[in-house]
């Protein structure tokens, strides 16, 4: 006897059943609408990339999370994509005649062998939007505006878009006198400020071999607070001797001014110089979005990466963009009950019941006409009592059942039943589609 295979998923992976996919599609469609409203075009890249394409772009800590792949008879070392930015860089390097600026979005799964937890999976979708070939801060501000518009369109009213700049972080390291080889550890510690507090950061810095006087200067800096413009003013006072930090502060001031002109609400944007995006390829402004509840991590994250494409071409090309974590966004929307009531459990709008074998051709013809009129329609596929057919429709969330019995057939009518309210009405068969649509819009 053949051994029974357990239907288990790999750790950190999950199935998305139709009801979940319908909710996901609702969210993704809203995201896509906003992306395209700003003129970003769709792009698709393969799930598998050459390993050498991905390695050396993210940093050692991130690269430990990559999934390697190899065909039994193949020689190429391959890997599942870790994000969508490096594949974009490869595409731009391979198609250097693309008109600039090149504005693209991509909605696709990526894979990371992280420890699974709430809102974090090993296979998850990213919704990326990027602009390549535009060096000015207007491109960065537009990316932030896109994030603002997406979350507003989805119904979020309480969220914060955090802004920082890698140049400011570099300046902090310079002014504090931290050696270059200790900067990655410095950044990781600063990034934990909100979670572990000033005392925890100080302990981490001291344990990371950062000199006491440098730790003291860093502690003074980390106590800077206030509104965005106030924070930038204080940073300019503290970091005035760093030309690089001055550039970063100026870039954030320009972005804030542009966001005002774009109509982005000031209370949704905050400069947070302790925010550190983990990927090493960022070179300028960085941004992420968080919500107060549930504490689920960042919903979006990105920044400017002017040197990434140059790793493929030998010539730097300015680029900026962000990624929306669709899993986390949906998790938050479900926990907050934010999904509209009109997002149904099924794509089917009407079930045409089958009275008996003699009336099956009439039921099939009715279903065909409904589909031609734009109504998603099922015909019940088994010979079962009408009560079983209604039970199926109710269980699967189909909003309307249609009856075509001998009396209806002779009269050229059908009977519609609204399964949520139990209301019934008889209508001429040619008006069935309009009647179904009217009821479906109420569901």
Provide a role label for each language-model segment.
Residues 1-21, 70, 179:
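Auxiliary tRNA-acceptor-end handling modules of aminoacyl-tRNA synthetases
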Residues 43-78, 120:
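Polyanion/phosphate-binding surface patch
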Residues 15, 31, 173-181:
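Phosphate-rich ligand and nucleic-acid binding surfaces
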